[in-house]
A protein has these predicted regions:
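Beta1/beta-strand and adjacent pyrophosphate-binding region of the FAD-binding site
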Residues: 2-14, 172-177
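Glycine-rich flavin
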Residues: 3-6, 22-29, 34-170, 203, ...
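N-terminal Rossmann-like FAD-binding beta1-loop-alpha1 element of flavoenzymes
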Residues: 8-32, 185-191
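Cofactor-binding loop segments of dinucleotide-utilizing enzymes, especially the Rossmann-like FAD-
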Residues: 13, 36, 179, 202
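Glycine/Thr-rich phosphate-binding loops of Rossmann-like dinucleotide-binding domains
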Residues: 19, 147-149, 185-186, 215
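Residue-level detector of conserved catalytic or cofactor/ligand-binding positions
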Residues: 201-215
Length: 215
């Protein structure tokens, strides 16, 4: 068993973890960055970057639909779902590449790839053969979407907001469960791109004006 000692161990190499690591180094302390999954922040890989790319395509389609009202007649709008998603993934991967480069620029002695767990206060087990001793531990693991048990019986037909950007083509129809920011953004974008969208929400009335307009 290999034992490594640092002033601070940071679990998670996303935006928060990277910021914590840099802050520790800026104060002259030793730090290690631990990541069990692929490098690339939530924003770049499955969050704001790919979602805004999908929204940009949706806004282009929506603008073309609304153009006749301004005296501009572009003709029938044809949406190529495969081309839309190919561009989303291509640009997303480019953004992720910048993040990966940033992580990989860190001294290899100060970054570990593996899942960490506490075995005692100030002691982490990383993978099968590394222990990390640290005076302080920053937990910046983020979160993952959860599928309710009653929906898991639908198998592969159920996807999360993380999965939508891996599709090769736009779906013909989709049921969006949840009217939060993510659900509304994706639901509106897909609807503007020709997807039949049904929105399911627990609240009867939404008072926030922007969300009302989106619905």
């Amino acid at each position: 068993m290999k034992t490594l000692t640092f002033d601070v161990a940071v679990i998670g190499a996303g935006s928060a973890g990277m910021s914590a690591y840099r802050a520790v180094k800026a104060h002259g302390k030793t730090a290690v960055l631990i990541e069990g999954g692929p490098y690339g922040t939530t924003c770049a890989r499955v969050g704001c970057m790919p979602s805004k790319l999908l929204i940009a395509a949706a806004e282009a389609a929506h603008a073309a639909d609304e153009a006749p009202g301004f005296g501009v007649h572009p003709g029938p709008v044809r949406i190529d779902g495969k081309q839309v998603m190919q561009r989303v993934r291509s640009e997303r991967d480019r953004f992720v590449g910048f993040v990966v480069e940033s992580v990989e620029s860190i001294d290899p002695a100060e970054r570990l790839h593996g899942y960490a767990r506490f075995i005692s206060p100030g002691c982490l087990q990383v993978g099968d053969d590394i222990q990390v001793m640290a005076e302080r531990v920053v937990i910046a693991t983020g979160s993952t979407p959860q599928i309710p048990p009653e929906l898991r019986t639908l198998g592969s037909r159920v996807i999360t907001s993380d999965d939508i950007f891996e599709r090769d083509d736009l779906p013909e129809s989709v049921a969006v469960v949840g009217a939060g920011v993510i659900g509304l953004e994706l639901g509106q974008a897909l609807q503007r791109l020709g997807v039949r969208v049904a929105l399911f929400l627990s609240l009867i009335h939404i008072s926030e004006p922007t969300r009302q307009e989106a619905i």
